[in-house]
Amino acid sequence: MASKKSSPKKSSAKIKPWTMSMPDDQFERMRQILAAPSPIGLEAAMSTGVIEPMMREYMPDGWAIHRFKGHAGLVLDTHPGDTSRPSIMLIGHADKIRMQVRSISEDGKIYINTDSFLPNVIVGHEVLLFSEEPEKPGNWRRIEGGTIEAIGAIHFSEPSQRSGDKGLSPDSIYLELQMHGEKAKKRLEKLGVKAGDPIILNRPIKRGFSPDTYYGAYLDNGLGCFMVTELGRLLAESPLKNLRVLLSIATHEEIGRFGAAALAGDFKPDVLIGTDVGHDYLAAPNLGAKRMNPEAMGKGFALTVGSIVTPYLNQLIMEACQKAEIPVQTSVVGRDTGTDAMGAALAGFDCVATSIGFPIRNMHTISETGHTADILGALHGMFTSLHFMDAMNKGKGITREDFKKNHPRLDLTKRLESGW
């Protein structure tokens, strides 16, 4: 389908943006957010560098943006300081999994930690290395033109590696900066390259071959941050009357959801909704035999079931999305959602929670792949759900008591007969 030139202003019964191609201007905003260099612990490029200016562009008077001391998270608050309203926090995380400099060899090879990347899938790809100026700590620079390598050439590999029986050892992975000549290590150290310096993949997203698809690095989880940012845009045009919304950009998710726990602990929202990527299980090689729940990209966003998820909140989201004819898939989890939805539980306070996801392919690679319909479905699904809850109780909005008294009672269930 051909792309439109401008973004739709809001959901409606007649216009269904989740059934249409993402407009070019909206896709460009998504590309900018995902392209921000924001490795774990250094997320300000995305949060304050890209997202905050976007939020300030549309936020009305009376809204506020909160920043924090110990992390680069961000919260756009529709009703700052108003604790009388039920509050709903939606969180995406800005941190990207990264590699780190481990050591520098005499010939200039920079051996690295691969973190959450499978070594085999990063070899040969271009990366960005960030380091501080030795004489001016805090003055960060970037080195472009490097690639991740391992054994140097197939000619130097072991027979078992050539046959595919053996993979690459994480400690064999290094950054190639094409260094040659004398004192290669000292020249790199003089530039400021040192142990611990972050390295990230360098491939901004592009539209894919198939309609409404896209691919590139770090859909995990620029997508959640993009969705949260765009949700604020819709709410600015069609505000809620009774609810306080906290549109949040978290940090440190990839190493334990610590940013979400800090944000949730600060604001203590009544409701927390984590937004993150999920898996397209139908397209995942060798997973069909495991009989996974058939999530697939292009079929809509996924609503999580299990772990700390509050059933009544899921019920409300499903009711709202069914009424608006927004497709919703199911993501089944066990003891942990694996997302920032765990923030309140980790912070240790009472909170309604759920998690939504966007099924993607090739997670934690340079070619993560998604479908714009899933993002648009999640965006308008959350927008519709917020307005649905805002209109409850004859227009007075959902209350904290509604959540307290609507926990499912399985002891009151009726026996189901086959009926055939």
Language-model-detected regions and their locations in the chain:
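N-terminal hydrophobic/helix-forming segments and targeting peptides
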Residues: M1-W420
